[in-house]
């Protein structure tokens, strides 16, 4: 991360793996320990790369003079050509997550590369999809759901989402869903929400209290 001016980048989005710097345009506090970082082309205009829903970026930060890399799944939709978002949980003792949460601010530049990953869904693979995620692990699912919504996909979307408690849910700020989406959520610890299902999900779809 650096506050300096960026070097010139490509004039058109790259279709393969890209490497360079992106500017932190916005930082959203999703939960007490989860932040979303909105990254944009420091030169303005569209992103210098394209991606598929479900792919991730590699972020590199310098700690103690050494580069440290971490992979973060893209949470935004590929239809948003002007920015890309990654959602990061502050893990206890996490070198990069701690750096991002404690030191990175709007206007900073982040060294990024990508996109990478084959866990993708564009709507062409089948006519319905079941997504299962927990905690901050919902980020690739949110990218998929937002993309399908933006494209007015006619298929059925089912989302099973588990969190430890309501305040730890990472999907609250812009939990856009497909008009055909069905969502089931469960919390592993009790909460005050009336009739909120509690328990860990089993393989057969039931919950273990």
What are these language model-derived features?
Residues 3, 10, 15, 93-209:
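FNR/FR-type flavoprotein reductase catalytic core
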Residues 3-108, 127, 163-165, 190-194:
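Ferredoxin-reductase
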